[in-house]
């Protein structure tokens, strides 16, 4: 299932990682682990945030998914299902067939 992970980094932990020069390596490790199809980084709500879209093969993968962000950055992590345009078209077509909506 395609999911989006939103990791809102703790400012002090992120500052420490930047000052120590470890931020690039820590982010690379997290990205290598998740292998996202898309990754975006920027300020949301005044805090450094990562938005990653990737395939979660099984719900049992959830604990390990956010762990690098929890342990390295004391981040607030949210994971939720998302769709691309093709997924949405397919879902709406199924909805139309099953709900009787014309």
Region annotations inferred by a language model:
Residues 1-102:
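Conserved, structured core segments of small domains
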């Amino acid at each position: 299932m395609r999911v989006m992970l939103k990791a809102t980094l703790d400012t002090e932990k992120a500052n420490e990682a930047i000052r120590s020069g470890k931020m690039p390596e820590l982010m690379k490790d997290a990205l290598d682990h998740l292998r996202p199809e898309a990754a975006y980084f920027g300020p949301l709500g005044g805090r450094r945030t990562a938005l990653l879209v990737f395939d979660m093969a099984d719900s049992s993968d959830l604990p390990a998914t956010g762990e690098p962000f929890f342990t390295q950055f004391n981040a607030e992590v949210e994971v939720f299902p998302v769709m691309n345009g093709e997924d949405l078209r397919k879902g709406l077509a199924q909805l139309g067939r099953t709900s009787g909506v014309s």
